[in-house]
């Protein structure tokens, strides 16, 4: 039995997806956001350093503009995300303030982390904010990101973005909150006998092949992008927990070593009972 030990974890990146922030009705899940702010603030009070990678701009924008479906037109998608990003950050700021925690916004595009000078600048920004006891809230800059062959500036989705941020900031742990319990050996929505994988030490071709499917109507991420994110984390000698975000307080249980979700950690670094 692999024993999870997170006592030495100081810097944590938490990624929350749109499906965890927006209710099936399209309305904002205020209770979930409040719980998340409480948990992060509690961790900060214990001396942890937390960076939040938050999707949700599109979901917030759809709610504000009273649009039932995600636009298919790119320009309209960018407009909706732009409106939603402001609303999302406003809400985060209000709720975190209730717990005496200050937040900041960092919007990234892929080219920022590709070029050395801009990468150094954004790294310094993260370090400065963290040193001030501020929670950086990161999202992709959807209003200006493009995905064209000659000038691709999109990360693809925030699963990959969270892995990039974990690498940039040299985080001790990436916690990815989703609408699933973790990585299963097969699709649990199809197979009743699907088993949750408690620990993954190597991302095999079998695991990659078993991952697939799209995200929700509000988001873009699927299981494959989470597996690819785990690969990126491994490349940076990091570790990741993929878990259900239904109850953000479960983050505290994970950090206590409870075996929730799927723990991605290379086997040579695993401590045995």
Curated annotation (Swiss-Prot):
This is Glutamate 5-kinase. Its EC number is 2.7.2.11. It is an enzyme of class 2 (transferase). One of its GO terms (cellular component) is cytosol. One of its GO terms (molecular function) is ATP binding. Pathway: Amino-acid biosynthesis; L-proline biosynthesis; L-glutamate 5-semialdehyde from L-glutamate: step 1/2. It is found in: Cytoplasm. Coiled coil: none annotated. It comes from Streptococcus pyogenes serotype M18 (strain MGAS8232). Transmembrane segments: none annotated. The lineage of its organism: Bacteria, Bacillati, Bacillota, Bacilli, Lactobacillales. Keywords: Amino-acid biosynthesis, ATP-binding, Cytoplasm, Kinase, Nucleotide-binding, Proline biosynthesis, Transferase. GO terms for biological process: L-proline biosynthetic process. Catalyzes the transfer of a phosphate group to glutamate to form L-glutamate 5-phosphate. Substrate binds at residues 55, 142, 158. It catalyses: L-glutamate + ATP = L-glutamyl 5-phosphate + ADP. Belongs to the glutamate 5-kinase family.
